[in-house]
Amino acid sequence: MAKGIFNVPDVEHIGDILHYESLIKDNGGTQVRHFWNGEEGDECFIVFFAETEEKIKNIKSILENG
């Protein structure tokens, strides 16, 4: 298992985070956790796992572009 970490720089509400988590799961990621203090405008870190480093790279690309 490979681990990926994605930074969401400006979270307005939990829906923003759930959108990224759905993209991760829809593209083969598992065991998603996020770390956000709940403050509007603060950053959030999303930690996820996938079978290979290549899959992690693909998921990160999707998150950055979609």
What are these regions (language model features)?
Residues 7, 37-38, 59:
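General helical structural elements
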Residues 20-24, 56-66:
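Short amphipathic alpha-helices in soluble, non-transmembrane regions
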Residues 16-17, 21-53:
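Acidic, low-complexity, intrinsically disordered interaction modules
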Residues 1-11:
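Short glycine-/aliphatic-rich beta-strand segments at the starts of folded cytosolic domains
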Residues 5, 53-55:
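Compositionally biased non-globular segments, especially hydrophobic aliphatic-rich helices
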Residues 12, 31, 63:
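Residue-level signal for functionally critical sites in structured catalytic/ligand-binding pockets
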